[in-house]
């Protein structure tokens, strides 16, 4: 394993952050984007990799009807324009854990990062699931609490943080 570190920026997409998002996505967009961008620049300035992951559902009628967000080929699935893009490392996933994407998993295995920091959306969703997945890599796993949104209540958030800590994730 190398001494290289990586930041994984998860699901910072229009459908979750823009003004026309569904009401269930109640994030404080300016605050979250600012925190994520600060982390992006910190990692880049230190010479570490920044990796972007987007939740993408296949563009089929049932997904449009029943899910209604992050549909492949729609503007809602695109990375939110205020997120700073500092690398070409972008991966799509269909499930909450980014490690379920073979392309992503193979990339991460090839890079052999010693430490992985996760931020983005959502603590009780894809960011939390990816943190769990990352614990199986042998790398140190950190979840940036300040740069990770959570649309769920404090009780559910605390339960997820406790679960992640029990798996060895550091919450900072």
Please place each PLM-identified region on the residue numbering.
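Active-site-adjacent betaalpha module
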Residues: 1-6, 34-46, 67-172
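A short alpha/beta connector and helix-capping loop motif
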Residues: 3, 21-56
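N-terminal nucleotide-binding beta1-loop-alpha1 segment
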Residues: 7-12
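Alpha-helical structural elements
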Residues: 13, 47, 60-61, 108
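Catalytic metal-binding/acid-base residues of hydrolase active sites
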Residues: 13-15, 56-58, 96, 122
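A short, flexible beta-alpha/helix-coil linker loop
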Residues: 15, 22-23, 148
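Short, basic/glycine-rich phosphate-binding loops at helix/coil junctions
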Residues: 16-19, 56-63, 79-90
